[in-house]
Each structure stands twice: as structure tokens, then as C-alpha cells.
Amino acid sequence: MITLHSALTIAIAAKLPILLWGAPGSGKTSMITALAHDLDLPLEVVVGSIHEPSDFTGLPVVRETTTWFAPPHWAERLAEQGRGILFLDELTTAPPAVQAAMLRIVLEKTVGHLRLPPHVRIIAAANPPSVAADGWDLAAPLANRFIHLQWQPTAADIATGFISGFPRFTSLKAVSPNAAQIAAAKTHIGTFLRVRPQLVSVIPDSPDLAGQAWPSPRTWEMAAIAVATSWANGAGEDVITTLLIGAVGEAAGFEALSWLKNLDLPDPQTILRDPDGVALPIEVDRLHALLSAVVAVAVTELAETAAHDSDAAWETWRRAWRVIARVARTTPDVAATAAQSLAQHRPAGAPLPAELLELAPILRRAGLMP
């Protein structure tokens, strides 16, 4: 139960939509109510089965010469408060037309003509269609917009909760990742998908599996953000596993997790701070993944500093090239790929790296030298 609680708070910090699966009466709604209370967030509960599609797309209202899609009161309340949790309960009891109307809310946080504030989090709960009253399979486009988490409390969990109280979320508040951490995680996931391109998008054939987590470019990006947020909060492997599988499904999630574990790479931000002092891996695949992450972090830092701190941007530029120079001594092909990427983000007025002679062949490939 603690693993799921931690995964839930990390997904909230990552601003990712969450879908909680569990049997009827297992306490999903009670847990989300406790979560909102412990995190001091306003909570709006919306049960899809008792709403019409217009409750999510907005009710058309004629205003002079235009039509305004008026949002419902629950959306207006969230907008007024500026933050909160929108809890879409009993999702699999909502008919397909209502599920389709929810798509824009989950992905864009837009209800009619109203855009919900960035600090509104979206959580849904669903019973498996086989046990839901008048249940429907979750539509694949809607399912592919969530991190899927399984709520399966054991008898011991329930007994302990009754006797000693259920776990609180007050001690599990998570922080959001910074841009460099997200860039590094996306690079690692992208490098994995280069090795396993068959897993970029795998749409299940059966409706029941299509209503669960499965790989797509969207869910791989969600997986990368979840991994970055886990790193930012020092989460354990069990939490990362839960989130990865919740994003892309068991098969792809376990394979990606195994690949990431085998990489065992140093922190790319640490390497940028000390380009000559951190040992680099020898294996080509690990070296490629690490150098790609270093360049991704460098590009992120350049974008953040170039406009207002040219000295810091130039220093990041110089250090990134020093790392590439180290790699070029043993694996020039890997260095060439990184050089081509870094060269596209040269800060205005930044000098060429001091390692020019050593890097000359690489720089020519990157178009920095004739």
C-alpha cells in the first residue's frame, strides 16, 4: 500500500493524469478524499455515468453573434480556487459518448471554453468492466492518457487500517523535477526506444487490454516524466516500476526498467559540473545513452541561461564539449552524434571549444568547421 501511495504522490507532482483501478467497495474514493485532505487540495468528484457529454464539452449558449460553451459549476469552482483535484469516479460506468467527451479534459484540462489552472490534478477511478454495474470497456484513446495504478489492498492492509488508521499522505509530499532531470529521463527512454523500436507504439487487439496501459509516444513521454520525478524524490525501484508499468504496460515497462537498471549511469548533471573527474562507461550502448543525456541536460541549461547569463551559458557549452572530447578519444562515432546535436544549440557569440584540434574531425561532422 505504501508503494502505491508513493507512486500516487509522485504522479501528482509530475502533473500526470492517474487512473486508479480497483474492485467496488475497496476504498478508492475514500483514499482520494484522504489524499486531497492531507495535501490540502480542494476536491471535486464527478461521476461519469450520471452526466451527459455536454457536461464535459460545455453547454452551448448563444452570446450575441457567437456560441459560448459554458462550463459546469465544478469546473468553475476549480478555476476560481486555482488548484485542486478533479476526481472522475466510476469511469467504466460512463458510456462511450461520455468517455469521448472526457478526452480533452484529461489531456488539455479544458472544459467547454474554460481551461483549468495548471495546478489542478486529474485522478480517475474505475472498476474492471466485468464487475462494474452496466460496465463499459475503457476506450483506448482515453486509457492512453492515464498512468494506470492498481488499488488492491490486502486483508492485512484493511485490518491494520481499522486498528491503527490508514496511511496518511502528509509525509509523502513530492516535488516536481527540474527541466534537466526531465531531459535526462527522456533521453534514456529515447535511447531505449532506439534499441527496441517495436515498442514505440503497440496498440492491443482486444478491447479489455486496450483499456489498460499500453505503449505509445504519449505514454512513453509520461513514463519519462514519471521516472524524472521519481529521481527528483529519491524514489525506490518499486515505485519506479509501478509508474513505468502504469504508463506503458507490464511487458514494455519491465523491459525498459531492466534496460535502465543495466545502464547504471552516473548523473549527467554531475558530469557537466566535473567533465574530467567522473569515470565514463566503456560499453558503447551505455556510453551512447550517457552522452545523449549529458547533451540533453546541457541543451536544457543553455536554453535557461543564454538570454540572461551568457557567461553561464558559455561555461555549459564548454564543459559539454569537454565531455564529448573525452568520448571522441575512444568512440568517435558516438561523439559525432552528440556533437551534431550540441552544435545546433551554440549560444550567441560562444567561442569554439579549446579542444579544437582534438575535436576537429567531430566538429567537421557537426558543421562547425569547414
Name each region found by the language model:
Residues 1-86, 91-370:
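C-terminal regulatory/interaction module of P-loop NTP-utilizing enzymes
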